[in-house]
């Protein structure tokens, strides 16, 4: 690998992560922890999840469920879960979480979400840790007759352009994806030049209220 590339930016789920970690190359990671000496560029996942959970509570939700994907290399889902638990505790509300593995087949993931509605028919708020899951949950909820946002409010996380184009009404936490990528490139260039680079860079996020959250009165 070292004879083919000069440096690596790792930003997606990849089965070769272990190989990358041991490559004798400058590496920068986006939103995932690989090794203590590898710089990470991330959005403020804790603050974003706090913002999402509080947005649901401010709009009257009392039975909120958090769905997130487990992956050992992704610190962001863990930060989002921690924030969700903390905010729910602060408001003395029950914190319910549904987890799925990152490599969970789509049919199995859908079945898991169907069980969510079966087991918690009174759910009135869902915070999904990614927009794809939020869109899937929105579709399932509507198929079951939930009126969104009158009966059920949903918010995702990512704000990727593709999802916003496909599901423009979805409320979500928007990550500064372009800024993260630009900064990761700068960090990699600095590492390749032998310059000092911070081990962690955290960028702020924003809330897009969309149409799956109620309007605050």
Segments predicted by a language model, with ranges:
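Generic beta-sheet signal
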Residues: 11, 30-32, 43, 67, ...
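Glycine-rich phosphate/diphosphate-binding loops that line cofactor/substrate pockets in enzymes
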Residues: 53-64
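Alpha-helical recognition/docking segments in bacterial nutrient-uptake
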Residues: 1-54, 118, 122
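Flexible loop/turn connectors
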Residues: 96, 114-217
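Hinge/beta->alpha junction and helix N-cap segments in small-molecule ligand-binding domains
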Residues: 14, 41-51, 67-112, 127-135, ...
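Short acidic/polar active-site loop segments enriched in Thr and Asp
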Residues: 6, 61-63, 124
């Amino acid at each position: 690998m070292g004879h083919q590339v000069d440096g690596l930016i790792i930003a997606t789920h990849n089965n070769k992560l272990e190989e990358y970690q041991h490559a004798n190359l400058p590496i920068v990671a986006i939103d995932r922890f690989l090794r203590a000496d590898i710089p990470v560029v991330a959005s403020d996942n804790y603050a974003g999840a706090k913002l999402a959970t509080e947005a649901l509570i401010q709009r009257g939700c009392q039975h909120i469920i958090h769905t997130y994907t487990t992956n050992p290399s992704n610190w962001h889902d863990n930060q989002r879960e921690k924030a969700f638990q903390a905010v729910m505790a602060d408001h003395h509300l029950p914190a319910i979480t549904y987890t799925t593995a990152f490599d969970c087949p789509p049919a199995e993931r859908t079945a898991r979400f169907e069980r969510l509605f079966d087991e918690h028919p009174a759910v009135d708020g869902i915070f999904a840790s990614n927009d794809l899951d939020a869109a899937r949950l929105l579709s399932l909820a509507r198929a079951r007759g939930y009126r969104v946002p009158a009966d059920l409010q949903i918010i995702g996380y990512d704000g990727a352009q593709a999802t916003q184009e496909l599901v423009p009404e979805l409320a979500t936490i928007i990550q500064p994806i372009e800024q993260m990528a630009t900064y990761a490139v700068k960090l990699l260039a600095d590492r390749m030049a032998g310059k000092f680079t911070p081990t962690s860079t955290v960028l702020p996020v924003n809330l897009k209220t969309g149409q799956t959250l109620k309007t605050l009165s």
